[in-house]
Amino acid sequence: MTSAETNAYDPQQVESAAQKYWDATRAFEVDETSDKPKYYCLSMLPYPSGALHMGHVRNYTIGDVISRYKRMTGHNVLQPMGWDAFGLPAENAAIKNKTAPAAWTYKNIEHMRGQFKAMGYAVDWSREFATCRPDYYVHEQRMFTRLMRKGLAYRRNAVVNWDPVDQTVLANEQVIDGRGWRSGALVEKREIPQWFLRITDYAQELLDGLDELDGWPDSVKTMQRNWIGRSEGLEIQFDVRDVDGTALDPLRVFTTRPDTVMGVTFVSIAAEHPLALHAAKNNPELAALLSEMKQGGVSEAELETQEKRGMDTGLRAIHPVTGEKVPVWVANFVLMGYGTGAVMAVPGHDQRDNEVANKYGLPIKQVIALKDPRNDDERTWDGARWQDWYSDKNRAFELVNSAEFDGLDFQGAFEALAERFERKAQGQRRVNYRLRDWGVSRQRYWGCPIPVIYCDKCGAVPVPEEQLPVVLPEDVAFSGTGSPIKTDPEWRKTTCPECGGAAERETDTFDTFMESSWYYARYTSPGARDAVDKRGNYWLPVDQYIGGIEHAILHLMYFRFYHKLLRDARMVDSNEPARNLLCQGMVIAETYYRPNPDGSKDWINPADVEVQRDERGRITGATLIADGQPVVVGGTEKMSKSKNNGVDPQAMVDKYGADTVRLFSMFAAPPEQSLEWNEAGVDGMARFLRRLWAQVQKHAADGAAPALDVAALDANQKALRRKTHETIGKVGDDYGRRHSFNTAIAAVMELMNALAKFEDGSEQGRAVRQEALQAIVLLLNPITPHASHALWQVLGHGETLLEDQPFPQADAGALVRDALTLAVQVNGKLRGTIEVAADAAREQVEALALAEPNAAKFMEGLTVRKIIIVPGKIVNIVAA
């Protein structure tokens, strides 16, 4: 006997039965032959870490709700799933568990696939792939070789974090206080050859395309605009002289503030700049500083916050206007990988340059004065005391101490200097972008091999397409010191495809953002010989993409860029990969800890803590269950391993069932906001589902309901039916237009409360109840599909796929009210209410309002001046 045939709600039994039906009928497999409009709903693919966390549950439940709703509204819906399977965590786990990254990864995929299925997600599993499989990454290898031939992939030296003990490159997050996370060695900055993709060739298109993405959050588009960082300025040439006065290669600097060029008192260059290396040859002190600067991380964020340091190289730059010699300084805040690796320093009008000049006693010149000073501070200038107006080009100012340019404003100075530099071949107008080419090389093992062969005679040669894929060996001994493919001469050895001579393979692997930049397209074309075939143009672009806002810059930028590469390769015909983007909020939870004598904290999982609360539910204290002793309440934070405040979704599913977990994760907060995990709230959702189950069972126990006869309904029956159809209208809008799932659930709960108060056992009373219960089951189906699957059968229907049932539509006739309750105000203050017929004439409404006893009391001795009626809502009597 199934749970649906008894009065007891057994979520495990209900969910198992529904999932077996979906699997047996291949319910969610789709193709391109449907005559329904397509809808592609995609949540960012997961990393197979080994177990689902609550962030996964929230992300994929949002996608599943949208997918099921869209199918019920008549769409051909694709919701696929795969695994972003390469990457550093697998290497770290392999070291810890003394296994190969591949074995660890595939084991995790098997386990997590089972967890996803247990959540009841309506996924087309026939399209599943893991990005670490050769039949997936062969396509990105092929694309890369084509980009090489087009000049869009190239190799140059770039600075990386180098661990001299482990002999490996470290990601920025693996550098902790300047040391390698594993070896503890001081990290060095090292220049090594790396492969890049020319994303900068698409910078303007990536920027312009943001204006077309109406369905993306403004916050994401703003972050991308800032990351692309388009700026207009001048590239100016400074001639350079060596210590002995001989000419060296000139410096070229880009500036958006050529109006300040007369304030240049020194020029800053990166530690890796060729001129810095040249100057250090005969300057041991400078050489030592350059070596020191090569230690530590290379991220832009680190450079912004670290102490500004520098040294005079002894070289001199020739000011392009005055001819004055200004010192060339090496500075730790200038990046070789950004721009030209050199910047003109204007300490009078740039805060960073000002800090350096004041620290080292360098000259500071004022070349800008405000035309509209607002206070004494703005009337005076003091280079030793920075003020924001010194660098504000949006204020009305004029040039001073700038020779023939004195008196010009920003635009006037820009034009005059541009004309001068271009005429004298000392500079030119340039559009510059903050965006840099995408470095795709990683000196790691567990990644897609870069398909390049190195030949002493022919140089870097792309692997011929017929020799692809270059397969990464998976059965390796992995220690974390070096890469197994670097230390395997047999794997490296090959022949040059151009001359047939001895050659070696590239041992770097791709940045894992490569795999996640085009996976969405592969889902559309399983089994295709190329990355995407004609099926891609049926499904693409993605209609709804879902993922965290932390991906706004890197993944979502590369995602857009790669789509343009696919378009230019004539694989897709759209310009952007996704029409709409939903960025879900974090899942947060309370934290608990005990302090240690050394100041560290032992974080305790919420499951191991007993919490005391006041009458309003606020936490007043907490104790460790194991010993009954107090623990410190640390506040709510994002669920994480570091704070040990994660909640195991599997434990919640085992205790409450997947539908309850899904229901809570959609009810507790709007999708874009943070969701605070609260097991009391989960328990509340479980009670709600049990109430629904009991109501349906009780109703069904009385036998089949008669047909609904709208004309025969009494006032109470009409009221319940009106509530049902009001709920249908609201929930449909919440699902479809607003993605406001929490308010949709709240509306269904209100309808449930109305049903609980409806005690009409008559024929039409049961018919109205049947309609309401059927509506509730269908309305909740996108969120609680297992329970809905079972309850639909209890309500007298055969076992079927509810996603193929039409989503309920509100009956406009049911929404019409026979009588209305209107508020009666006297001079804008509420004094009573009246009941009027829906079609009552104005005169009748006015008479009833004037006769309302409490309102009449407040009008004693006053004269009615006018009566204002807001139809269906308010009657306001204005009296004096």
Swiss-Prot record:
Q: Which InterPro entries match?
A: aa-tRNA-synth_I_CS, aa-tRNA-synth_Ia, Leu-tRNA-ligase, Leu_tRNA-synth_edit, M/V/L/I-tRNA-synth_anticd-bd, Methionyl/Leucyl_tRNA_Synth, Rossmann-like_a/b/a_fold, tRNAsynth_Ia_anticodon-bd
Identify the main location. cytoplasm
Q: Does the keyword Ligase apply?
A: yes
Q: Which GO terms describe its cellular component?
A: cytosol
Locate the motif 'HIGH' region. 46-56
User: E.C. number, please?
Assistant: 6.1.1.4
Task: Give any single GO term for biological process.
Answer: leucyl-tRNA aminoacylation
Q: What is this protein called?
A: Leucine--tRNA ligase
Read off the lineage from the record: Bacteria, Pseudomonadati, Pseudomonadota, Gammaproteobacteria, Lysobacterales
